[in-house]
């Protein structure tokens, strides 16, 4: 076991080597990207040893050897939790990041700040691994905030563009809302249980834990772009493609789901939280799949598909299958990173063109990228015996056979068929048909950095699901029998999606549609969500501010109350004074007549 713990720590320490190397004489700035890529590849190979040992023995480990601080009765120590989730996730994250780093060496070649870019990516990976291996909430929070700030820096990498800055701010603001939930949960655990250690929280297992779990669900909603806090994920495509591949496919966005998986001992008997996560996940997966149907930006389609898959993971947590959700995280990382890298290869070759309507016929010019993109799309739809099938099919089978909300199940199935539609749409628009891009485009995909990185993920997309699912120890008693129609539901809805996509594609080719049609306005405008949230709220706020400034301050206080009131009082006085004509005889006579009449009346009454 000493070797197990040592190698686990060596894996984490290897990643800090490129940062420490900068203080040595042998450091050459021009080779820095190579240092980072090599360090990550070594870390991946090293991490496989403790992972194999763990699969063989099934022995969990907690490394806790540095006392950190004591607050009254709370003792915090720096501790790493090497359990099933962290031991399986570390090699997957390192393998995917290794490929993305190699891809970045090609994609960001001409960037003047490439060393800083690699530093940011490396720090991002380190904070993600801190989050995954953390054994207490405080350490987990450091990793949580780390991936948040690194995403902000990387999305806004091209800071000269207003869109990139807006997207980065949007990401950090939506994550802030989620962080409020995390901090509330931490505060609740501290005040009620006086501990932040995961073991102690699970051991005490408080019965009234709805409050912190809702906080954690809010945190997961912000970080994993669930419905309500989802708009930042498609906007984050403003960053460079390697950033999209790393942040929005395999690591950062699954942090929210990972948090809920970590807390599954508290959620497994809490039906209230399970219902919330199930319904939230089902709404997310359907809504974002609908939005993906009519997008034209290749990266935005893949971003919405990521959000849709995150909704599916949320559904899995809602039906009390955390291990299955984790399996989907691991399998999804391979083909989603590869899809982003293929789109990056196409964008780079077509002079930064992202609109799929301006592509077409790329299967001849870019055969390797085409192969990878088709395999990735099929893996995403859950094609049998590709990586996605091993988790996606199981999730839908589990949802079919569990006591679940029928509406949530129906929404998930519709979203699954939509997945097939938008995947087919990318293939038809970008790869098949006639070329619709300018003829003088210099297409070249013969760079070994590009080919090798995509090749590794392609192999992962073919075999990783089989390997990972066969190395998972069974956690609950499996369903022994199942009606064949429930077993084949996932496949049937996917095939339906493919048929529908072919039909729509045929109609589009033959110009049967009248553009713009109201039928897909909801999808094109992203469900009116940005219009309402990003336009209406600031408009109401600004108009209210304007009204209060102009009406309340100017018109009422500075005009009506002070100057106008004074002038009105003076006008009244001056009117009174000017009405005095100075006719003294007439005034005396009027007094006299009044006195005489009153005396006569007085005497008369006597």
Curated annotation (Swiss-Prot):
Keywords: Electron transport, Formylation, Membrane, Mitochondrion, Mitochondrion inner membrane, NAD, Respiratory chain, Translocase, Transmembrane, Transmembrane helix, Transport, Ubiquinone. Core subunit of respiratory chain NADH dehydrogenase (Complex I) which is composed of 45 different subunits. The chain crosses the membrane at residues 4-24, 43-63, 87-107, 117-137, 140-160, 171-191, 213-233, 241-261, 273-293, 310-330, 366-386, 413-433, 457-477, 482-502, 582-602. One of its GO terms (cellular component) is mitochondrial inner membrane. GO terms for biological process: electron transport coupled proton transport; mitochondrial electron transport, NADH to ubiquinone; mitochondrial respiratory chain complex I assembly. It is found in: Mitochondrion inner membrane. It is a multi-pass membrane protein. Belongs to the complex I subunit 5 family. InterPro entries: NADH_DH_su5_C, NADHpl_OxRdtase_5_subgr, ND/Mrp_TM, NU5C-like, Proton_antipo_N. This is NADH-ubiquinone oxidoreductase chain 5. Its EC number is 7.1.1.2. It comes from the Eukaryota. Pfam families: NADH5_C (PF06455), Proton_antipo_M (PF00361), Proton_antipo_N (PF00662). Core subunit of the mitochondrial membrane respiratory chain NADH dehydrogenase (Complex I) which catalyzes electron transfer from NADH through the respiratory chain, using ubiquinone as an electron acceptor. Essential for the catalytic activity and assembly of complex I. It catalyses: a ubiquinone + NADH + 5 H(+)(in) = a ubiquinol + NAD(+) + 4 H(+)(out). It comes from Bos taurus (Bovine). PANTHER family: NADH-UBIQUINONE OXIDOREDUCTASE CHAIN 5.
């Amino acid at each position: 076991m000493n070797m197990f713990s040592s190698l686990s720590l060596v894996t984490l320490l290897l990643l800090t080597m490129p940062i420490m190397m900068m203080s040595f004489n042998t450091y050459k700035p021009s080779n820095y990207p190579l240092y980072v890529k090599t360090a990550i590849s070594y870390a991946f190979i090293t991490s496989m040893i403790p992972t194999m040992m763990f699969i063989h023995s099934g022995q969990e480990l907690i490394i806790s050897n540095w006392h950190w601080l004591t607050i009254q009765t709370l003792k915090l120590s720096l501790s790493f939790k090497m359990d099933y989730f962290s031991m399986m996730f570390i090699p997957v994250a390192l393998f995917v990041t290794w490929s993305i780093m190699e891809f970045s060496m090609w994609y960001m070649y001409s960037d003047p700040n490439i060393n800083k870019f690699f530093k940011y990516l490396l720090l991002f990976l380190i904070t993600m691994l801190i989050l995954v291996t953390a054994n207490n909430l405080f350490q987990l929070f450091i990793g949580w905030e780390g991936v948040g700030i690194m995403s902000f820096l990387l999305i806004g990498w091209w800071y000269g563009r207003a869109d990139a800055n807006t997207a980065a701010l949007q990401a950090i603001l939506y994550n802030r809302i989620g962080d409020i939930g995390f901090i509330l949960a931490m505060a609740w655990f501290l005040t009620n249980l006086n501990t932040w250690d995961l073991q102690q929280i699970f051991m005490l297992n408080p019965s009234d834990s709805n409050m912190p779990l809702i906080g954690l669900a809010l945190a997961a909603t912000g970080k994993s772009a669930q419905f309500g806090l989802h708009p930042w994920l498609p906007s984050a495509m403003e960053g460079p493609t390697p950033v999209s591949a790393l942040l929005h496919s395999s690591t950062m966005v699954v942090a929210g789901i990972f948090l809920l998986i970590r807390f599954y001992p508290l959620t497994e008997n809490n039906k209230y939280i399970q219902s919330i996560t199930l319904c939230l996940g089902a709404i997310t997966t359907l809504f974002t799949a609908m939005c993906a149907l009519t997008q034209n930006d290749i990266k935005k389609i893949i971003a919405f598909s990521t959000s849709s898959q995150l909704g599916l993971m949320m559904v899995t947590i809602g039906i009390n299958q955390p291990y299955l959700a984790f399996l989907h995280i691991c399998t999804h990382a391979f083909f989603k990173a590869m899809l982003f890298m293929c789109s990056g290869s196409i964008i780079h070759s077509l002079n930064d063109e992202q609109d799929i309507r301006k592509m077409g016929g790329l299967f001849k010019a870019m055969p390797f990228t085409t192969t990878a993109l088709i395999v990735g799309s099929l893996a995403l739809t859950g094609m049998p015996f590709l990586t996605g099938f091993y988790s996606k099919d199981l999730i839908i089978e589990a949802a079919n056979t569990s006591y679940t909300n029928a509406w949530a199940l129906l929404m998930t199935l519709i979203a699954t068929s939509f997945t097939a539609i938008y995947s087919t749409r990318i293939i038809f628009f970008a790869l098949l048909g006639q070329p619709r891009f300018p003829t003088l485009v210099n297409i070249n995909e013969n760079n070994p950095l590009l080919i090798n990185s995509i090749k590794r993920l392609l192999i992962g997309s073919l075999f990783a699901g089989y390997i990972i699912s066969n190395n998972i120890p069974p956690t609950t008693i499996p369903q022994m029998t199942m009606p064949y129609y429930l077993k084949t539901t996932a496949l049937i809805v996917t095939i339906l999606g493919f048929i529908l996509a072919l039909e729509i594609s045929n109609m589009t080719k033959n110009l049967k549609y009248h553009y713009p049609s109201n039928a897909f306005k909801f999808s094109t405008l992203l469900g009116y969500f940005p219009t309402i949230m990003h336009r209406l709220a600031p408009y109401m706020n600004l108009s209210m501010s304007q009204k209060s400034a102009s009406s309340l301050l100017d018109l009422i206080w500075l005009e009506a109350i002070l100057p106008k009131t004074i002038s009105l009082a003076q006008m009244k006085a001056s009117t009174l004074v000017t009405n005095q004509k100075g006719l003294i005889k007439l005034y005396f006579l009027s007094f006299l007549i009044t006195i005489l009449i009153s005396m006569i009346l007085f005497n008369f009454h006597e």
